[in-house]
Amino acid sequence: MINKKISLGVLSILTAFSLQSVSYACTGFIIGKDLTKDGSLLYGRTEDLEPHHNKNFIVRLAKDNPAGEKWKDLSNGFEYPLPEHSYRYSAIPDVTPNKGVYDEAGFNECGVSMSATVSASANDAIQKIDPYVKNGLAESSMASVILPSVKTAREGVALIAKIVTEKGAAEGNIVTLADKDGIWYMEILSGHQYVAIKFPDDKYAVFPNTFYLGHVDFNDKENTIASEDVEKVAKKAKSYIEVDGKFHIAKSYNPPLNDANRSRSFSGIKSLDPDSKVTYKDSNYELLQSTDKTFSLEDAMKLQRNRFEGLDLKPLDQMALDGKGKPKSKKAVKGYAYPISNPNVMEAHIFQLKKDIPAELGGGVMWLSIGSPRNAPYLPYLGNISRTYEAYQEKSTQYNDKSWYWTVSHINDLVAAHPKPFGTKVIDEMKGLEKTWIAEQDKSTKEISDLVVSDPKAAQEKADKISLDRAEKTFKRLKAIEAKLVEEKPKNKKGLNRS
């Protein structure tokens, strides 16, 4: 057993981050199917809040609910009636449900996938007119209420719209839902205002914690779902802005772009398309980005691991290591910025949706890294699994050597604290594993897809076995890497190992 102790060096890095004015820091992305090398739709998110925040990966089984039973969010008092029957779905919850469940992302048994949410906030003028509702719908409840209740992505968007209209939103959020017909991108703008669009197949997007929608055709009911008063509220708040004679949602609802959102928007776009004309000084970044390039799953993984490679910026968390002291709140430091891959990442997920994968399997694969993928691998999971590996289910709020999250967290801490001796050895091995799994995944998915038609139960058992075996082998390897890093880390002047 390895005793988990964090060195002063690591603590100084994490403390530096806590001093930043980044109260939430998820980064989402979408790559339309016309822009991928294999025709798959790619979308996902890094879930960011703070270091050392345990996440689980579980499956919530289908169930019938008694009449009148409600979902209750203990973190803010939100309640909503449960459906007569809840569909099975996978989830990535927190381990402190009294502070919010935060199921975050997963597939349901109907082939709907969801990532919820990228937090955002309307400007002060908007909030005075349509304030957020304390016990309204929040990220903490989003996936838990929607995934067990809907058969299509559009139904999911419509249900969110209904709840926000009737009960209000507790906060601003960006939500993505997808199925065999494509992906919806939704912005919950203020207490009762929202806009959702069917995302175009020939565009890509990178979206950290601010709103991005520009002009939307509200008359296009097939591809748009919006609240009735979204323009009226902006006009009443005197924050209404037009671009080229048309209402611009983001410019009307957003506060000024902050440095953390600027750095992640810019670096994310540049990660996917180095030839993009965006600059670090742009006043805003459009949601729908165009390119003549095509992308792979590995490009999406690279995006979520981005730390300004190839750009004239350094990650903010390196400041303590570089001897420049702790960053001061709300004060930019030249040359340093907030990266997509940062110490606050608690998990990262990528949905890879393909037309030839049945809805019973989720219509695709979720590639998941519990813990930051900076030095950990993405593992593939189909949407029909019924259980997950035991290391994903440890609920400790402190280091636990049986926990996937805490093991990865420790590995990341060790590599961050000792970059010179450890270098890229760990991540290089992780990328090698991912390359093998990507090559294997099409074959195993085809076999399970063929089986699900004749024997859904056998298909589920096979998907379970493959994913459980892979997770068990990978976790054993992660434990071996963790032990080796502890053994090889530099000693201090007294000859003692520094954790």
Curated annotation (Swiss-Prot):
Entry's EC annotation: 3.4.13.19
UniProt catalytic activity: an L-aminoacyl-L-amino acid + H2O = 2 an L-alpha-amino acid
Gene that specifies this protein: pepDB
Pfam family, one: Peptidase_C69
GO molecular function, one term: dipeptidase activity
Entry protein name: Probable dipeptidase B
Domain of life: Bacteria
GO biological process: proteolysis
Keywords attached to this entry: Dipeptidase, Hydrolase, Protease
Top-level EC class: hydrolase
Presence of keyword Protease: yes
InterPro entries cross-referenced by the UniProt entry: C69_dipept_A-like (IPR047804), Peptidase_C69 (IPR005322)
Family, as annotated: Belongs to the peptidase C69 family.
Active site: C26
Transmembrane segments: none
